[in-house]
Amino acid sequence: MGLRNVLRIGHPALRTCAAEIPDDWFGSQRLQQLIDDLFDTKLACSGAGLAAPQIDEPWRIFVVGMGHNPRYPDADPLPDRALINPVIKSIGDELSAGWEGCLSVPGLRGEVERWQRIHLKWQDREGAFHTEDLQDFHAPVSYTHLTLPTKRIV
């Protein structure tokens, strides 16, 4: 499929809870195509992350990654990866506020408060589990796309 349309603010799919990717999808062409479509669409829109519900797919998966990005000129590079069935926990109580954008709300940014540090657990394309602690720009990007649906903006 390649590039997909990004749903815009107000679309009901952006307020629907995403379902976990079933075990029998791991390693399948269907999952690989969904991941490829998410990355292609994110790249075409100069995004840092994109969640499946944003392209009208009801699954708990998001992709992140960027090198130099004109939308985030001061951000450190973020490695490309697909995070499937992610679970997040805050590390400590420290919150930070930052200006964030969303591909589903083009042209607008808002100040959003997020956990400064998070512990993230997810599965990769093949179903293997991974864990990582994230902070600074990497934590809010992951948190934003993990917590869809959100009613703050969409």
Predicted regions and their residues:
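Positively charged
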Residues: 1-146
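Single conserved hydrophobic/aromatic residue that forms the stacking wall/gate
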Residues: 150-154
